[in-house]
């Protein structure tokens, strides 16, 4: 009887050769590229006169540097315009599909690949971006790579990799009202630490994971990297297969039936042996907010900033540093902390279900005075679907700005930036110093619904209080 994990099975299927020193040459089934980490890689190929080995397995988009208020060309930023033009030239020269602006398929790379059906169970997926682990939601092994490795994949369609250990994160029960996958992963990272996953792949499993939608699973896997794991994944199941059916690049007809049969066989076997296992109770998890300068510095919205005596000695220096930077006092409640900017979007939480959750809070309410709040769909497809359901109107009526797709304020590579000491409520994935533009800017990570609640009240607010006062509506057009 087979007794392997999904990670073991996918690794073995993609092994090309065992290399000196213990690493493995691993075939890459899908290579995703964007405008920031690909120019130098293409330049290296050109210097050596090398072709792209498998252009049909490479797909490009533009996301990091694009403005979200107006995407009219040429961009006001000449560097951003040059980066996009370079990507367009490279894709044309090497025969690579580019999901460009206005194509109907452009968006954040980790949003468009799943929605187009490019990401499928059993694949190895590589991209020059930290949050490539997103694609593990499909039962793929997906990892972020650096520019030199982007070059290697373009040239050889393979990478030299060291095999990881596998930690199973089992989650019992179900998440409560107002608690989302974002809260679950922030709770996991808080509990295990930002370095606990080093050398590991995280397998997310258990009753609470089984009932998550694909978009929620993507949020979960997206932030596995923030816990130190090289990748995170969920075993493929009926939820996965239903999501893929009808997607542009997904198999159809008899090919789909054969694919599903094979995809099912990839799941970790019941008697699979893991290197480590950790169990969580979903029902005990509350809406989360980060208070510090790492994603591991998170607390439930009804908790207080940790005091020194509640922390391990090794945690105290960075906690003190975080409090100084964030202008927070140990022991103070996180609920009620005022915010300046509220951002809903990113590869973590810029999908349709994320926008729906936030719109449900915004509907019939209005952004607090003095708060800048904006919504950035993760892709052109997400934007059009949201507009078809009337979500853009809900947000605009509530005082939010409705933007064009892109990475936006997740990182400081485009015009969407914090200024000075502004503090943001953000549905993105990193709260490092200066991450959102200003070298002195501050970031509070939370779910899209929590961001919407902060926008409405002007401060960190337990979204469950607003949910209890929300009248259910079947349509956002009402």
UniProtKB/Swiss-Prot annotation:
GO molecular function annotation: 3-isopropylmalate dehydratase activity; 4 iron, 4 sulfur cluster binding; metal ion binding
Originating species: Prochlorococcus marinus (strain MIT 9313)
Stored InterPro entries: 3-IsopropMal_deHydase_lsu, Acnase/IPM_dHydase_lsu_aba_1/3, Acoase/IPM_deHydtase_lsu_aba, Aconitase_4Fe-4S_BS, Aconitase_4Fe-4S_dom, IPM_dehydratase_rel_enz, IPMI_cat
NCBIfam families: leuC, PRK05478.1, PRK12466.1
Signal sequence region: none
EC number, UniProt record: 4.2.1.33
Keyword line: 4Fe-4S, Amino-acid biosynthesis, Branched-chain amino acid biosynthesis, Iron, Iron-sulfur, Leucine biosynthesis, Lyase, Metal-binding
Disulfide links within the chain: none
Note on cofactor: Binds 1 [4Fe-4S] cluster per subunit.
Gene3D superfamilies noted in UniProt: Aconitase, domain 3
Subunit comment: Heterodimer of LeuC and LeuD.
The protein's name: 3-isopropylmalate dehydratase large subunit
Cofactor(s) listed in the protein's UniProt record: [4Fe-4S] cluster
Catalytic activity, as annotated: (2R,3S)-3-isopropylmalate = (2S)-2-isopropylmalate
């Amino acid at each position: 009887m087979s007794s392997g994990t999904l990670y073991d099975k996918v690794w073995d299927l993609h092994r090309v050769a065992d290399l000196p020193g213990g690493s493995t040459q691993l075939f890459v089934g899908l290579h995703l590229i964007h405008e920031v980490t690909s120019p130098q890689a293409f330049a290296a190929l050109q210097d050596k006169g090398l072709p792209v080995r498998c252009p049909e397995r490479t797909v490009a988009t533009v996301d990091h540097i694009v403005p979200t208020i107006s995407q009219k060309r040429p961009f006001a930023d000449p560097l951003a315009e040059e980066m996009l033009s370079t990507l367009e030239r490279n894709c044309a020269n090497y025969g690579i599909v580019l999901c460009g602006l206005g194509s109907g398929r452009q968006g954040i790379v980790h949003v468009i690949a799943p929605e187009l059906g490019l990401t499928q169970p059993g694949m190895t997926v590589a991209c020059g971006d930290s949050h490539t682990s997103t694609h593990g939601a499909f039962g793929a092994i997906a990892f972020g790579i650096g520019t030199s490795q982007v070059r290697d994949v373009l040239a050889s369609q393979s990478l030299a990799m060291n095999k990881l250990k596998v930690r199973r994160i089992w989650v019992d029960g179900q998440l409560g009202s107002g608690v989302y996958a974002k809260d679950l992963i922030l709770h996991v990272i808080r509990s295990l630490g930002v370095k606990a996953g080093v050398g590991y792949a995280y397998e997310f499993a258990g009753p609470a994971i089984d009932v998550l939608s694909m978009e929620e699973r993507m949020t979960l896997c997206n932030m596995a990297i923030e816990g130190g794991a090289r990748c995170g994944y969920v075993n493929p199941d009926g939820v996965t297969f239903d999501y893929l059916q009808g997607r542009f690049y997904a198999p159809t007809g008899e090919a789909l039936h054969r694919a599903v049969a094979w995809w099912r066989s990839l799941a970790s076997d019941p008697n699979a042996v893991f290197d480590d296992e950790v169990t969580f109770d979903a029902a005990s998890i509350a809406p989360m907010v980060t208070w510090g300068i790492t994603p591991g510095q998170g607390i439930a919205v009804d908790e207080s900033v940790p005091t020194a005596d509640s922390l391990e000695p090794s945690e105290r220096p960075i906690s003190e540093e975080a409090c100084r930077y964030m202008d927070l006092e140990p022991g103070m409640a996180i609920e009620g902390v005022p915010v300046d900017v509220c951002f809903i979007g990113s590869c973590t939480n810029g999908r349709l279900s994320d926008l729906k959750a936030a719109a449900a809070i915004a509907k019939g309410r209005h952004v607090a005075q003095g708060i800048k709040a904006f919504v950035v769909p993760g892709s052109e497809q997400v934007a059009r679907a949201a507009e078809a359901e009337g979500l853009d109107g809900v947000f605009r009526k509530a005082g939010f700005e409705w933007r064009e797709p892109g990475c936006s304020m997740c990182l400081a590579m485009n015009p969407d930036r914090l200024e000075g000491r502004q503090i943001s409520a953000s549905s993105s994935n990193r709260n490092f110093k200066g991450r959102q533009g200003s070298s002195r800017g501050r970031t509070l990570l939370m779910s899209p619904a929590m961001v919407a609640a902060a926008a409405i009240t002007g401060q960190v607010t337990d979204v469950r209080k607003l949910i209890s006062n929300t009248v259910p509506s079947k349509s956002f057009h009402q």
